[in-house]
Amino acid sequence: MAGYNKEEKAFTRSIHNLENSYFRTKFEPTLSRFQGCTSGIGVISDTDAQPLVINSHLGRFAIVTVAKIQNLDELAQQLLDQNMHFAELSSGKTNQTELISLLIIPGRTFVEGIENVFRHIKGSCSMLLLTEDGIIAARDKWGRTPIVIGRKEDGFAATSESTAFDNLDYQI
Protein backbone atom coordinates (compact mmCIF):
# COMPACT_ATOMS: atom_id res chain seq x y z
CA MET A 1 0.00 0.00 0.00
CA ALA A 2 1.09 3.57 -0.61
CA GLY A 3 -0.57 6.75 0.58
CA TYR A 4 -0.01 10.46 0.08
CA ASN A 5 -0.37 13.08 2.80
CA LYS A 6 -0.91 16.49 1.17
CA GLU A 7 -0.25 18.48 4.36
CA GLU A 8 3.14 16.85 4.92
CA LYS A 9 3.79 16.41 1.18
CA ALA A 10 4.92 12.87 1.97
CA PHE A 11 4.42 9.38 0.63
CA THR A 12 4.00 6.43 3.00
CA ARG A 13 4.57 2.87 1.81
CA SER A 14 4.12 -0.57 3.30
CA ILE A 15 4.83 -3.89 1.57
CA HIS A 16 3.90 -7.26 3.07
CA ASN A 17 4.13 -10.86 1.95
CA LEU A 18 0.57 -12.20 1.98
CA GLU A 19 1.41 -15.88 1.62
CA ASN A 20 -0.53 -18.04 4.09
CA SER A 21 -2.25 -15.02 5.62
CA TYR A 22 -5.13 -12.60 5.17
CA PHE A 23 -4.62 -9.05 3.95
CA ARG A 24 -6.07 -7.44 7.06
CA THR A 25 -3.83 -9.29 9.54
CA LYS A 26 -0.72 -8.14 7.68
CA PHE A 27 -1.66 -4.48 7.24
CA GLU A 28 -3.68 -3.65 10.35
CA PRO A 29 -0.58 -3.10 12.55
CA THR A 30 0.83 -0.55 10.06
CA LEU A 31 -2.36 1.40 9.27
CA SER A 32 -1.50 4.14 11.79
CA ARG A 33 1.47 5.08 9.57
CA PHE A 34 -1.07 6.17 6.93
CA GLN A 35 -2.75 8.70 9.26
CA GLY A 36 -3.42 11.91 7.30
CA CYS A 37 -3.15 10.30 3.87
CA THR A 38 -5.98 11.50 1.64
CA SER A 39 -5.32 9.14 -1.27
CA GLY A 40 -3.72 5.77 -1.71
CA ILE A 41 -3.08 2.79 -3.96
CA GLY A 42 -2.30 -0.86 -3.42
CA VAL A 43 -2.09 -4.23 -5.09
CA ILE A 44 -1.70 -7.85 -4.15
CA SER A 45 1.05 -9.35 -6.32
CA ASP A 46 2.38 -12.88 -6.32
CA THR A 47 5.56 -11.86 -8.13
CA ASP A 48 6.69 -8.25 -7.62
CA ALA A 49 7.25 -6.24 -4.45
CA GLN A 50 5.10 -3.14 -4.85
CA PRO A 51 4.14 -0.33 -4.69
CA LEU A 52 7.33 1.40 -5.67
CA VAL A 53 7.91 5.07 -4.87
CA ILE A 54 9.84 6.92 -7.57
CA ASN A 55 11.38 10.39 -7.69
CA SER A 56 11.79 11.72 -11.23
CA HIS A 57 11.61 14.89 -13.30
CA LEU A 58 7.83 14.28 -13.43
CA GLY A 59 7.71 14.54 -9.66
CA ARG A 60 7.38 11.90 -6.97
CA PHE A 61 4.93 9.08 -7.56
CA ALA A 62 4.01 5.63 -6.32
CA ILE A 63 3.12 2.92 -8.81
CA VAL A 64 1.39 -0.47 -8.74
CA THR A 65 0.83 -2.73 -11.73
CA VAL A 66 -0.91 -5.88 -12.80
CA ALA A 67 1.14 -7.04 -15.76
CA LYS A 68 2.28 -9.93 -17.89
CA ILE A 69 5.06 -8.55 -20.05
CA GLN A 70 6.24 -11.04 -22.65
CA ASN A 71 9.27 -9.00 -23.72
CA LEU A 72 10.44 -8.14 -20.19
CA ASP A 73 14.01 -9.40 -20.63
CA GLU A 74 14.41 -7.60 -23.98
CA LEU A 75 13.13 -4.30 -22.56
CA ALA A 76 15.29 -4.67 -19.45
CA GLN A 77 18.39 -5.15 -21.62
CA GLN A 78 17.49 -2.10 -23.73
CA LEU A 79 17.20 0.00 -20.57
CA LEU A 80 20.51 -1.33 -19.24
CA ASP A 81 22.11 -0.47 -22.60
CA GLN A 82 20.85 3.11 -22.04
CA ASN A 83 22.74 3.20 -18.71
CA MET A 84 19.58 2.76 -16.64
CA HIS A 85 19.64 0.53 -13.56
CA PHE A 86 17.25 -1.71 -11.65
CA ALA A 87 17.15 -1.51 -7.86
CA GLU A 88 14.21 -3.88 -7.27
CA LEU A 89 14.64 -7.54 -8.14
CA SER A 90 11.92 -10.14 -7.63
CA SER A 91 13.29 -13.66 -7.12
CA GLY A 92 16.42 -12.62 -9.03
CA LYS A 93 14.41 -11.31 -11.98
CA THR A 94 13.53 -7.82 -13.16
CA ASN A 95 10.62 -6.33 -11.23
CA GLN A 96 7.96 -5.59 -13.88
CA THR A 97 6.68 -2.59 -11.94
CA GLU A 98 10.12 -1.00 -11.88
CA LEU A 99 10.54 -1.62 -15.60
CA ILE A 100 7.17 0.07 -16.22
CA SER A 101 8.25 3.07 -14.12
CA LEU A 102 11.48 3.36 -16.14
CA LEU A 103 9.40 3.44 -19.33
CA ILE A 104 7.16 6.16 -17.88
CA ILE A 105 9.83 8.63 -16.76
CA PRO A 106 11.19 9.58 -20.22
CA GLY A 107 7.81 11.19 -20.99
CA ARG A 108 7.26 14.93 -20.60
CA THR A 109 4.06 14.11 -18.69
CA PHE A 110 2.69 11.05 -16.93
CA VAL A 111 0.27 10.52 -19.82
CA GLU A 112 3.10 10.59 -22.38
CA GLY A 113 5.06 8.18 -20.21
CA ILE A 114 2.14 5.76 -19.96
CA GLU A 115 1.68 5.93 -23.73
CA ASN A 116 5.39 5.05 -24.03
CA VAL A 117 4.79 1.96 -21.90
CA PHE A 118 2.02 0.75 -24.19
CA ARG A 119 4.15 1.38 -27.29
CA HIS A 120 6.97 -0.79 -25.97
CA ILE A 121 5.51 -3.72 -24.06
CA LYS A 122 4.25 -6.93 -25.57
CA GLY A 123 1.61 -8.34 -23.30
CA SER A 124 -0.66 -6.54 -20.89
CA CYS A 125 -0.32 -4.01 -18.11
CA SER A 126 -2.78 -2.02 -16.05
CA MET A 127 -1.47 0.45 -13.51
CA LEU A 128 -2.28 2.98 -10.84
CA LEU A 129 0.00 5.95 -10.22
CA LEU A 130 -0.33 7.97 -7.04
CA THR A 131 1.05 11.44 -7.71
CA GLU A 132 1.16 14.56 -5.58
CA ASP A 133 -1.90 15.73 -7.58
CA GLY A 134 -4.01 12.56 -7.42
CA ILE A 135 -4.34 9.07 -8.86
CA ILE A 136 -3.92 8.11 -12.51
CA ALA A 137 -5.51 4.82 -13.58
CA ALA A 138 -4.43 3.28 -16.89
CA ARG A 139 -6.03 0.11 -18.17
CA ASP A 140 -4.14 -2.28 -20.38
CA LYS A 141 -4.95 -1.46 -24.00
CA TRP A 142 -6.27 -4.95 -24.70
CA GLY A 143 -8.66 -4.95 -21.74
CA ARG A 144 -7.22 -8.15 -20.25
CA THR A 145 -6.82 -6.54 -16.83
CA PRO A 146 -9.72 -4.12 -16.41
CA ILE A 147 -9.90 -1.10 -14.14
CA VAL A 148 -13.32 -0.09 -12.84
CA ILE A 149 -13.92 3.40 -11.45
CA GLY A 150 -16.40 3.79 -8.60
CA ARG A 151 -17.79 7.03 -7.23
CA LYS A 152 -19.54 8.16 -4.10
CA GLU A 153 -20.22 11.50 -2.49
CA ASP A 154 -16.80 11.98 -0.91
CA GLY A 155 -14.51 10.35 -3.43
CA PHE A 156 -13.56 7.88 -6.10
CA ALA A 157 -12.07 4.39 -6.11
CA ALA A 158 -10.41 2.31 -8.81
CA THR A 159 -10.19 -1.47 -8.76
CA SER A 160 -9.79 -4.49 -11.00
CA GLU A 161 -12.58 -6.29 -9.11
CA SER A 162 -15.77 -4.29 -8.58
CA THR A 163 -17.48 -6.68 -6.15
CA ALA A 164 -16.53 -4.60 -3.09
CA PHE A 165 -18.12 -1.44 -4.49
CA ASP A 166 -21.63 -2.47 -3.40
CA ASN A 167 -20.48 -3.05 0.19
CA LEU A 168 -18.70 0.32 0.25
CA ASP A 169 -21.57 2.27 -1.39
CA TYR A 170 -19.64 3.17 -4.55
CA GLN A 171 -21.55 3.60 -7.80
CA ILE A 172 -20.01 2.33 -11.01
Please place each PLM-identified region on the residue numbering.
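Conserved short alpha-helical segments that host acidic/polar catalytic motifs at enzyme active sites
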Residues: 1-172
